[in-house]
Amino acid sequence: MEKVRLTAFVHGHVQGVGFRWWTTSQARELKLAGSASNLSDGRVCVVAEGPQTQCEELLRRLKENPSSYRRPGHVDTVIEQWGEPRDVEGFVER
């Protein structure tokens, strides 16, 4: 199974509502590595590495409206970028 790197910039009301914690929980459930970080402009940057199907599932959960996974906050838009994995380990909230 091919590994990929997903970088997702999540726009909306996603800071101060438990969004990074929720994202970390979802990524760990999907056995992905990476991080979820607040950006100074109010977005959250999610970086995930692992099998493409698992990264696509995380992206689907990030975008889904309304969320069937009890995602906190409100997501307006998710901008995604795909690339080569950098072999990070674990998933952390920054």
Swiss-Prot record:
Keyword Hydrolase: yes
NCBIfam families recorded: PRK14422.1 (NF010997)
GO MF term set: acylphosphatase activity
Keyword annotations from UniProtKB, A to Z: Hydrolase
Organism annotation: Corynebacterium glutamicum (strain ATCC 13032 / DSM 20300 / JCM 1318 / BCRC 11384 / CCUG 27702 / LMG 3730 / NBRC 12168 / NCIMB 10025 / NRRL B-2784 / 534)
EC number: 3.6.1.7
Protein name: Acylphosphatase
Keyword Hydrolase: yes
Family in the record: Belongs to the acylphosphatase family.
Domain Acylphosphatase-like: 5-94
Catalytic reactions on record: an acyl phosphate + H2O = a carboxylate + phosphate + H(+)
